[in-house]
Amino acid sequence: MRRLVPNLIWIACGTAAVVGLGVVALKRGESISAAWVLTAAVCSYLVAFRFYSKIIAAKVFALDATRRTPSERLNDGRDYCPTNRWIVFGHHFAAIAGPGPLVGPTLAAQFGYLPGAIWIIVGVALGGAVQDFVILASSVRRNGKTLGQMAKEEIGTVAGYTALVAVLGIMIVLIAVLALVVVNALGESPWGIVTVGLTIPIALLMGAYMRWFRPEKVLEATAIGIVLLIVALYAGRWVAEHPVYGPMFTLQRTTLAWAIMIYGFAASVLPVWLLLAPRDYLSAFVKIGVVIALALGIVIVLPPLHMPAVTQFVDGSGPVFAGKVFPFAFITIACGAISGFHALISSGTTPKILQREPDARFIGYGGMLMESLVATLALIAACALTPGEYFAINAPAAALGTTVESAAEAIRNWGFTLDPAQFNALTQQVGEQRLLSRTGGAPSLAVGMATIFSNAFSGSGALALWYHFAIMFEALFILTTLDAGTRVGRFMLQDLLKHAWAPLGRISWYPAVVITSAMFVAMWGYFLYQGVTDPLGGINSLWPLFGIANQLLASVALCVGTTVIIKMGKARFAWLTLVPLAWLVSVTMTAGYQKIFSPEPRLGFLSHARIFTDALAEGRIPAGAASADAARQIIFNDRLDAAVAAFFMLAVIVILAASAREWWTILSGRKAAVSTEVPYEPALAAAMLRADSLGTVVATEPARRTRRLAPRALFGAIGSAVHVIIGAPDWRRYANAIRSMPRRLDAGGAEVLATPTEFAAERLAARYSKPGSRCC
């Protein structure tokens, strides 16, 4: 009977997912409620996490709570540091949830809501979440090694070096694009600059609070951070409206670009517990809070999806971007379903701070499901706009003209309608001077979110407030990915440079950390500055490569994941990664080939460059270029795009071929499967500690934790306050401290717990020693 109720709940959840997907896929001829898409997504995520992720956790990796993690084994207080699972989840989610799940589904809405909804829901359960989980678990078992290191050790030297160079190049492109999006979102916006900027000192305060003043008091630090964040939101609005401070914090895009470079460098060299983890944890509260509020708003408003299920633009004639629904819907959505960038975070910062192995399931698989929910909500917000409003905001001026009237005529020719008067009124209501041809996805998403929020919570009078809040939310969403990405890029650069000079690869040598951080920031910072100062060159020309590079990186990660599973002797489970790998390779290679060689100038890099070259040869300036020099710059950029795309594709082909060869030699018995996992070591926190009334240490297994009753929790809080006031030894703080600190050795060399007397003497002495001492 005890199992009957849970089973019935899961059956109902699965049924709701199937019904929701059926309605989304089969209903035609009229708009459907967004509730169907939301129901299908949420129920599918719950079923996938409960059953599909459990196969990976139990059958493939057999995650063990008693196994020591890299954060304990290599604890250095900077990069390796045992961290509370909720803070790790917050950091991980904040790091992976960048512009992809917001902008990608918004742009892909030009195909209709159906292709995007199906791919986001199915793709994440079978592909994206699997990749993140497998790479995270693999890295944890290998002392937190990066994706490039694992490729070298698991697949081979050639594939490893190819992966290191290719992944580093892809990372430079990805981080520069992320930084450019932040600059465009915050440029000349004092509200956003002040609010986002204040999250940095707030994070420093939280990090110091949990490190020195109240270790492991996560809830207290969280409450302080949330209160200060609310203050920061209102402070940003106050500064923006102030006649003196408003212009003072209205920064130019070039100034903001330098500021972002400085921040990226600081986030890479400072200890992870001081800035990166608490700031991402704080940002995760904003992200998750807004996501929950948006989902709640959709449930309250139940907006109809005005965009058709499938539009005529599936043939590749779309005005927002060129390309057919296959493969470009999957390339454009990117992070909403699967993202190669996540593999860098899952093998970068996250495995180095994970405290318990079983948390990898919740953080790796669950974190990706949460990001997919963000993509679903972004798709709903975009499709809740009328098609006329959507295309008026997202289509370029070349397709719409420069006036609302010309845009209405162009949209009418596409089979949709736009009322110029209503569109002008919408522009005024959101507090913008212009919404027409605000391409990129972010403005239209902000309009959709603001409309849902205002209808659900405040009324149309606060539309401008909600719009600017959404813009700030998008900028905050992206910036957290930039700082974690910079740190991961530093790890990768150290992996590469250690072959030239070994000390540069030592993460424990601080000069190497500073040097490689400065080098990596200079790499993406150069392209960022070029993109900010020259709209025709720099990173702007590399934007079309963002989706392709990201998905090719996911292919590399799945190759590594498949190899790890086979070498573990679990080849019967290799289909978990082989299925998404096969699909992803077919999609990305098709998209890359079309972007390079397509004869359609709107799609192919080389054909577009040829049009401009022929025009210059005839002595005329081609359409779309302001001068002959600008035309030459566009030609260079197109050819650079083609060369970079070809290099990335070739690198992935090399890695895929090397992986297939490794799989064949192992499965055919020609080569023994040698695992590179770190041998099992018992975790320092394998046995939870508690103290009885006399202070005697009692070991209890983790699985036998008991819930505190309310009175006991109250007495515990009072006791903690007394400890702080009178300075008495705090046994719980000691128990938390020894999870990451070596215990003393007895005469035989075995680790033993300190006695209560030793503990009290040490704890009292620590009160008068420097901050950061053991048990402090």
Give the positions of each predicted feature.
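Loop-to-transmembrane helix boundary motifs in multi-pass membrane proteins
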Residues: 154-172, 366-373, 439-441, 459-470, ...
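Extracellular/periplasmic helix-exit of transmembrane alpha-helices
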Residues: 298-314, 369-447, 484, 529-534
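Membrane-interface "cap" regions at the ends of multi-pass membrane proteins
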Residues: 1-14, 47-102, 284, 323-324, ...
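Polybasic interaction patches
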Residues: 711-776
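Membrane-interface helix-loop-helix modules in multi-pass membrane proteins
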Residues: 22-28, 33, 79-142, 153-157, ...
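Flexible loop linkers connecting adjacent transmembrane helices
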Residues: 53-81, 107, 121, 130-159, ...
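Extracellular loop-to-transmembrane helix junctions
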Residues: 30-50, 108-138, 148, 191-203, ...
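Transmembrane helix-loop junctions in multi-pass membrane proteins
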Residues: 18-31, 102, 114, 172-188, ...
